[in-house]
Amino acid sequence: MASPDLLFNLRNLFYLGAYQAAINNSDVPGLDADAAAERDAIVFRSYVALGSYQLVISEIDSSAATSLQAVKLLALYLSGDKESAIVSLKEWLSDSAVGSNPVLRLIAGIIFMHEQDYTEALKHTHSGGTLDLHALNVQIFIKMHRSDYAEKQLKIMQQIDEDHTLTQLANAWLDIAVGGSKIREAYLIFQDFAEKYPMTGMVLNGKAVCCMHMGSFDEAETLLLEALNKDAKDPETLANLIVCNLHLGKPSSRYLSQLKLSHPDHVLVKRAVSAEDNFERALQAVA
């Protein structure tokens, strides 16, 4: 008989965006060395997701496991030390002793996806090996507008574990990317998460995006305001509220100002700044 998966609940909390809950519930007894290392990686990735980059950088020293060193590189990268993080990352990846570590490959994929260097990201993630890597492949292929390749990755995940939270999440992401009648299926996946697990900003945003695709902007706004109450600085919540309010004919400048302050590199901020610059140039040309 298979031994129980002691990290099942912890992983689910992390995957669904309940990062503080994952940290609070990380004291799991009876873990062997490998499971303890995975637990530590989840905890530090949760701190990264909450923006506590310096805590991660200071607490993971040079003697830590490869998986934790990888998470530290992600914290360095997101804290603004991008060039140094990428140089170190490439050194680690070229080291035959640790370069194949699945967490290191996952972090490489995440960092290069942030860089919008999807070819480089896939170089490290395409061979898969874990559900996390396959799920990241789905995200990368969606970013590349290759839903056909994303679907192949999803099918591999479904063969491994169709009911796994990551498989269901990847299914929802792909359904939203494909659109049309698939949006309803994505909505039902997020609804299922909402019924089974504590409601998180990620699940609320997922439901809200589906609602917007289906034209239910009032329901989407209600969900997004609930998400905003959970985290007033979450970039996806703010970005989705901007889009939702534009469709509802409501002012969205306050949310855009918040997004500019907390996440100046967000794609929506860059588009808004570019539009403002173009408008200024047009005014000057007329003047």
From Swiss-Prot:
InterPro entries: Coatomer_esu (IPR006822), TPR-like_helical_dom_sf (IPR011990). It is a peripheral membrane protein. Pfam families: Coatomer_E. Disulfide bonds: none annotated. Keywords: Cytoplasm, Cytoplasmic vesicle, ER-Golgi transport, Golgi apparatus, Membrane, Protein transport, Transport. Gene3D superfamilies: Tetratricopeptide repeat domain (1.25.40.10). It comes from the Eukaryota. One of its GO terms (cellular component) is Golgi membrane. It is found in: Cytoplasm; Golgi apparatus membrane; Cytoplasmic vesicle, COPI-coated vesicle membrane. Its main location: cytoplasm. GO terms for biological process: endoplasmic reticulum to Golgi vesicle-mediated transport; intra-Golgi vesicle-mediated transport; protein transport; retrograde vesicle-mediated transport, Golgi to endoplasmic reticulum. GO terms for molecular function: structural molecule activity. Oligomeric complex that consists of at least the alpha, beta, beta', gamma, delta, epsilon and zeta subunits. The coatomer is a cytosolic protein complex that binds to dilysine motifs and reversibly associates with Golgi non-clathrin-coated vesicles, which further mediate biosynthetic protein transport from the ER, via the Golgi up to the trans Golgi network. The coatomer complex is required for budding from Golgi membranes, and is essential for the retrograde Golgi-to-ER transport of dilysine-tagged proteins. PANTHER family: COATOMER SUBUNIT EPSILON. Belongs to the COPE family. This is Coatomer subunit epsilon-1. It comes from Oryza sativa subsp. japonica (Rice). The gene is COPE1.
